[in-house]
Amino acid sequence: MTKGRNCSLDYMLNKDWTKNTLRIDKDVLYVVGGLYGNNFALELINSKAEKENAQIIFNGDMHWFDINKDDFLTVENNSIKGIKLLGNVEYELINSKDNLGCGCNYPEDVSEGIVERSNAIHQMMKDNLG
C-alpha cells in the first residue's frame, strides 16, 4: 500500500449498519461534507441552521486547513451541536496503524507531489494534535 494512494478497508460499512440508525425529528437537515477546517463557513452554516432549527450532520473531512491545534479545536468546538461522521482525514488521525498517510485514495493520474503534500499536511496535523 502506498500512503495517500489507498484508503482503509475499515472505511467500509458493516452489512448490518441500518440496524443501528438514528431518527432525526427535524424539518430541516443540513449535510455538510468537506468542510476542511473552514471556520468561516462553519460559522455561516451554524447561523443558518440556528435560524431554521436545522440538524447538522458533518459527513466527514471536517478538518484539513485547520492544521494548528487551536484552529482544529475551534472547528471542533463550533461543531459541537452537529452529528459528526468520520472521513478519511479524521479516521487517519486516530488510526494507530499509520500506514495510509492521509488516506486520500488518490488515483494514479494525480501527481506524486500532490500525494506527498497531502500526506505531509496530514502528518503535521497529527503531530500538532499529539
Task: Locate predicted features.
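N-terminal active-site segment of His-dependent metallophosphoesterases
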Residues: 1-78
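Active-site neighborhood of divalent metal-dependent phosphoester bond hydrolases
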Residues: 65-130
